[in-house]
Every structure is written in structure tokens, then in C-alpha cells.
Amino acid sequence: MTKYLLLDIDDTIAPSMYRGSDAIEIETWGRGHLAIPKYIVEWVKLFSKKENQSIWWCTDRSNETTQIEKQLPLKADGKLMFTKPPKGVWKKQAAIIRFAEEHPKDTVICADNDCDLMNSDKLLGNLHLIIPTGDIKALSKEDLATIDNLK
């Protein structure tokens, strides 16, 4: 069994305009400021190295995912594709649900500040939503512990 983490960037791992003393700056080549708190960087690196755990990007910022992977460095196993949603369904939600359907015996965790937009009546039993609760508009240490403890 694998634990998949579907990970968003904006206001999930990278708070908007974050400039804290622990900020790890990501060069975006002129596409705006992007910084990730050190505690999140360290946790994500550890998560990605553990056996039977896999990070998949859940964002439409593909250029930034490449920069994050190169600069931290970090191993991500893929990116969700936001295409072909059913009519009237948020394309990101459709991709998340499709991923969970494709991995029915695994734990799928979506960490995204927009998870509250998902229709909860359409969620599968193996899909867990983590909405960041940190004061800086990012995943808190408690959120990260919750992810670690999900089986």
C-alpha cells in the first residue's frame, strides 16, 4: 500500500508573498515571488524519501514545480493533469477524484488550500483532504503530523 500526497503550491506549501526569516526562496525567473518555510521544506523532503510514499503535484504551476524540484532538491513522482472534467465539475476536483479511483487500495491525501471547494458527497473512502491551518496561510506543523499519521 502506498501513501500518495497530492500537493498544491500556493497558500499550501508557499504562503503568498512569504518573507519570514526561515524562508527558502525559489527562483521563478521573473514569474513572481515564491518562498517556502523551512519546516515545510524539511518535512516534504523527508516524506518524499520514505518507502511507499509518493508526492504528486496538484497545481497548474508546472514551471514552479520544476524549479522547486531542482532547487531544493526534491523528488516528486508526477503531476496531476487537469483535463476532461465532467460538465459542471471543478477540473482540479475531477483530477483528484480520478487519481483516488485509480489507486483504490492506497491512501490518497490532497493538501490544498482550495479543498473546501470540493463536493464532499463525491469523495472516496481512500481520499483525505487537508486544508492548511497555519497562521501564515500554509500547512502547519500539526497539518504535517496529521498527514504523517494517516494510513
Placement of each model-derived feature along the sequence:
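Short intrinsically disordered terminal tails
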Residues: 1-2, 151
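Alpha-helical substrate-recognition element adjacent to the catalytic core
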Residues: 2-90
